[in-house]
Structure formats: structure tokens, C-alpha cells
Amino acid sequence: MAYFKAVAYLAALASAAAFNPGSSFVPRLNAPATQPKAAKMTGPTMQAVPCGINGFGRIGRLVARIMIKDPETKLLQVNAGSATPDYMAYQFKYDSIHGRYQGDVVVDGDDLVIDGQRVITTRARDPKDIGWAKTGVEYLCESTGVFLTAEKAQPHIDAGVKKVIFSAPAKDDSLTVVMGVNAEDYKGQTDFISCASCTTNGLAPLVKCINDKWGIEEGLMTTIHAMTATQAVVDSSSRKDWRGGRAASGNIIPSSTGAAKAVAKVIPAVKGKLTGMAFRVPTIDVSVVDLTCRLAKDATYEEICAEVKRRANGDMKGFLGYTDEPLVSTDFETEPISSTFDAEAGISLNPRFVKLVAWYDNEWGYSNRVKDLMVHVAKVDAKVKA
């Protein structure tokens, strides 16, 4: 098995730069988030994690960008269904939200050469036909949205992959891990791990911080969520969700979400205590969660802000952020932090009843966590094997 190089000096630089000295705001930082203690390795120098991506949609492309720039990962192969190499290069290079890729992208036959790194591309529909073993892929980002159970993803394992990470909530009881919240739950015991959803990643770090200190008796979550590719450009048809069939760019659309309930998968102490809903709004990236909850112990709003800031600068750095500046959604575009608490937006009715607000880039932030989870899984596997 191939291992990856330790890049401690880069992690130190990332940690040092994560907060602007003149502000409490966490700025955009396209560097690996600080890994939890459970993911740290000791021993000999390692090589980059050999990675592959199945599916080249919004998340697949952004995970690819992040992997190419991260020395802890080596992207070997992307399977993109029917997309030609030329079109894949175009999709990779240009992005309406995150801008033009800052680097070289060259097509060489069926391969992409990105910043001098060769990435094999394939166009198989069935996982058993992709050929991961031929390129040495060991850790796979399953990003098609189709193979989201252990049974459906098993052909990836049969084809030579060691572990499959779902970039979406699993549709079975596969292990769910939110980095910065329950990374220690992975001990090498399974081949299939879900990174949950972007909204669960945006909510869970805040829930953990608050529940650890004061306890949460009950809570309601609302996510004000940017448009996604599942929505209609103009009024269309949706038998399952009539409102969801309306034009995304011209409406605020109430919708359902399982993100709040899913937090219980990574924080069992809040099982049965949280639920939520979504409003889909006409913006193309960045979302915000509103957590209204009843606390088990008294807390002033100032105490809550201080605790979130402490954790954001401490053991949850890279996953939980803090800002006390008057920011808006576009200020969080291409922000890698999972969840940035907005101290100026929240309110408190009394010491037990509070409304807390946190921003998240539902594309870039989540894609960083998918990459982080793949690296974490590889580190744990290496430690278990050793």
C-alpha cells in the first residue's frame, strides 16, 4: 500500500494563517484544515494518498481541484461517465463561483495533465468496468450520487479500491463521519464511509461546541440554502415536490432536509432533539444555518460567543470558524471552513433559549471535508496496519 508524505510545516503555516490578526473573521484559506488528533500519524515519512474520483459534477470537480493542490493527496484517475477529456478540462478550468483554476491544465490523449500531474480519465458507467486497480487508486471519492450504499459501491472494492468515501449522505447504515466532530469513530472497521451532507457539516460543528459546554435540550434548524443542480431553471415538473419544481432563480422555496436529524449520527447525545427545514433561495453558492435551541444550562449570549471563539481557535480550528464582522454571503465564497459562527447575527431570548447563526460554503467547504476525510481514513488505515 502506498502511504503519504507528512507535511507538518505546511499544516503549521495553515494554522498560523487561519485567522487575520486584525479581525476575528476566518478568511479564505485554500490549505488543508487542521486534522483532529485521531488522524495524526507517527512513524516514518509517508507518501501521498492515491486517490480517485467517480463522478465529475460540482463536488467531484472541486474535490479534484483541492486534491491537486494538496501534497497529502495524489489524484490518479477520474471517471466521468460520458464527458470527453476536452470537456473535463474545460469544466475543471472554469468555474462560475470559484473562478478560473490557477494553474496549467493540458489534455494529452485521454489524460489530463494538471500542474504537471497526470490524471487518467475514463468513461465507464458500471463501477466494475472503471479499472481503478490499473491506475493504483486506493481511496475513492464516490461523487455520482448513485452508488450510495455498501451494496451498490461494493464493485469499487472488487475493482481494487481499498476504501470508498461517499460525498453525500449514505442511503444505508454506512458509517457517517463529520470531520472535526466524530473523526475518531472511524477505526478502520469499514470500507464505506459517508461525509454526510454539506448542511450537516455546516451545522454539526456548532452543535458539538454548544452541546459539549451547555447541553442542548431541543432545537430547530433552518438552512437558507443556495440553489443546486437538482432545481429547475424555469417552472418545471416535480411530482415528488411541487414547490421544488418552481424556478430556482426567481423564488424562495421551502423544502425539506434531513441534515438536522443526521447530526445525531455523529453526535448521539442529540438524537431525537433536533429537526429542521430548508429555504432554497436564488443565490448560486454559500448557505447559512439558523439553529434555534433550548439549552440544558444557563448561558449568556456573550458566553456562547466566547466559547465558540475559543473552540474555533483551538481543537476545532479548520472546522469551526468565528466572525464578529458584518459579513454577507458572498464574503464566504471559497471558504474552506465547515461552519463559521456569526456572532453579530445571533440573539438570545433568555439564558436557556438562543438563536445561533453559522455560514458555510456548501460547495467548497464541503469538498474540503471530503478530501480531509479521505486523508484521515488513509492515516487511520496506515496506523492500524502498522
Swiss-Prot record:
Write out the catalytic residues in the record: C198 (nucleophile)
User: What is the E.C. number?
Assistant: 1.2.1.59
UniProt record, GO biological process? glucose metabolic process; glycolytic process; reductive pentose-phosphate cycle
Q: Name the SMART domains on file.
A: Gp_dh_N
What pathway annotation does it carry? Carbohydrate biosynthesis; Calvin cycle
Please provide, alphabetically and separated by semicolons, the GO molecular function terms listed in this UniProt record: glyceraldehyde-3-phosphate dehydrogenase (NAD+) (phosphorylating) activity; glyceraldehyde-3-phosphate dehydrogenase (NADP+) (phosphorylating) activity; NAD binding; NADP binding
Q: Where is this site: Activates thiol group during catalysis?
A: H225
What keywords would UniProt list here? Calvin cycle, Chloroplast, NAD, NADP, Oxidoreductase, Plastid, Transit peptide
Positions with a binding annotation for D-glyceraldehyde 3-phosphate: S197, C198, T199, T228, T257, G258, R280
For this entry, the transit peptide stretch runs: 1-45
Q: Where in the cell is it found?
A: Plastid, Chloroplast
Cellular component GO terms held in the UniProt record: chloroplast; cytosol
Q: Does the keyword Lipid biosynthesis apply?
A: no
Q: Name one Pfam family in it.
A: Gp_dh_N
Listed under catalytic activity are: D-glyceraldehyde 3-phosphate + phosphate + NADP(+) = (2R)-3-phospho-glyceroyl phosphate + NADPH + H(+); D-glyceraldehyde 3-phosphate + phosphate + NAD(+) = (2R)-3-phospho-glyceroyl phosphate + NADH + H(+)
InterPro entries reported in the protein's UniProt record: GlycerAld/Erythrose_P_DH (IPR020831), GlycerAld_3-P_DH_AS (IPR020830), GlycerAld_3-P_DH_cat (IPR020829), GlycerAld_3-P_DH_NAD(P)-bd (IPR020828), Glyceraldehyde-3-P_DH_1 (IPR006424), NAD(P)-bd_dom_sf (IPR036291)
Residues that, per the record, bind NADP(+): R58, I59, R125, N362
Instruction: Quote the PANTHER family the UniProt record gives.
Output: GLYCERALDEHYDE 3-PHOSPHATE DEHYDROGENASE, GLYCERALDEHYDE-3-PHOSPHATE DEHYDROGENASE-RELATED
Q: Which family does it belong to?
A: Belongs to the glyceraldehyde-3-phosphate dehydrogenase family.
Q: How does it assemble?
A: Homotetramer.
Q: What is this protein called?
A: Glyceraldehyde-3-phosphate dehydrogenase, chloroplastic
Instruction: List the gene name.
Output: GAPC1
